[in-house]
Amino acid sequence: MRSFFPSASFGSPLAITGHIGPTRATAGDSASESAVRPTCALTVRAALMLAAMTGLLFFAPPCWAAEPLLAPERSIGAVVDHYLDEKLKAAGVSPAPAADEATVARRLYLDLVGRIPTASEARRYVAAKESDKRARLIDELAGSVGFAHHNANEFDRLLAYGNPGAPSLRPYLLAAFKEQRPWDRMFRELLGLGAAPEKPETFVLKRLGDQDALARDVSSVFFGLNITCAQCHQHPYIASLTQDYFFGMQAFFARSQDFQGNLIERQAALPATYKAKDGTTRPVIPMFLSGETVALPAVDAAEAKKAFDEESKRIAELAKEYAKNKTLPPPAELNLRQRLAELALSDANRDRFARSLVNRLFHRLYGRGLVMSLDQMHAENAASHPELLAWLSRDFIDHGYDLARLIRGLVSSDAYARSSRWDSVEPPAPGLFAVAAIRPLTREQWGVSHQVASDPTKITAHERLDHPHMEALVAAAKSYGTLIEQPYDDLQIGVNEALKLSNAPELAKSTGAKLAAMLAKLPDRSQQIDEAVWTVWSRAPSSDEAALLAAFLEQRSTPPTESLQQMLWALVNSPEFRFNH
């Protein structure tokens, strides 16, 4: 067996000495992968022919399903396995075997509640004899408060879209996941079309000063298409994605305004234009990615200016009295953000809205999206498994955009539980999903898991409690998490992270202090080592690992508790802890 790590096993001397980062072989689409795409190519060819007549090439589904889909009553996990296995067979590739039970348990805890399991939780799962124990664990974790906290972290990062200055929407997201709000409702609320007390409209409010970024982020996050390249010229890869689309998406927010911290829609607006690449001046018309436009009343420029100025004066007067009476300007007859939501969720367009989120969740849980890159979902960028993407999107829509149901289904497949180890020199193409991806932990996952490994009683005390205690745990984890990089595709752990961790005396001092004290009370060395490895790595140590750790402790001249803490520090700084494998 060959591991993706630079040694034969996670618990090697390299791991103990604090080596960080896998040396994973990377490969593009192999010949075997591309050879099984004939129906996909035909679909793209048909889309190209249609585009020549309609001019809507880029919005055509990304290699949409060429074959009839499986029946809707099939389970999500079974459908994932069917389509992935079908392509593996066509490519002549046998998948990796199932991961061991301890690895599956750790993977589920990290993906569903954002932390490693405690030693007792991991042991309990491995020891359980029920044939449906994995399904039971998924139900338990998805029904816990940790599920809401973890998804609040994950979606907060998604909505920030890589902008470190983006406002945190975590309080809103936490409430939304606790109440199990569907994704379409959350979309409306984030556009300022609901009455959520946690102010999700901050997503728009804090971007009003940069409407270019607002148009980009809305298109990318919710519809899987980054339209930035069309801001100044025709998109280089999508022939029909012109400047009209960029400014058309931007126009949906042209009347939005920050009024004393409230997102309002103005009634009046000045006619807007932009200078096209060919030098002509063109009017800005609200236009969705489908090419559908919103008709605006024709007005004389002078009359529009007069109406705009008069409304501005009324808004200014209301602002002066807002502190006293909290009176908002009257709602506009035409709310362009409302029209954007209606267009996006219409029967004709909702599949794009659904596919974008499905693809992002698949990427999060499997290490790769069905379409890569995640914000380049268009007809010229084929999905690796178009029928699977189509089925999952249809299922997501048919079940009311239920996020928890989709996540639970995705982690129920056999493919999700595959081993991350491969027994040949080169692993198969990533797009085949033949072997589990090794995924770096997010800052939040690493920070909370670090606390669990250092003092497992924190979870015992707080895992079932609500907001205040869990929030304290998350807040403490964030201070640790800043020492590591947030994951991105093809991340390679660099020397900077190793240096930060090597020069964090307060972290080193706190890591495992309480656990080391607990271990020191155990009667013999083998029990200490066994408990340490179960706590940090969520599994039993191998005989070689146990011998290595015993030798390490025997060589220490420091007090027993301090020696144990040094051992724990090495375990926490190993690749096995840093990655979800």
Task: Label each region the model flagged.
Residues 45-62:
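Bacterial N-terminal signal peptides
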Residues 313-314, 327-357, 363-365:
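Structured secondary-structure scaffolds
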Residues 4-5, 10, 58-59:
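Aromatic (phenylalanine/tyrosine) cluster motif
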Residues 11, 18-21, 25-29, 55:
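Residue-identity detector for glycine
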Residues 295-330, 342-343:
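Long, low-complexity, polar/charged, intrinsically disordered or flexibly structured peripheral segments
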Residues 66-282, 352-393, 403, 407-519, ...:
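Short, structured secondary-structure elements
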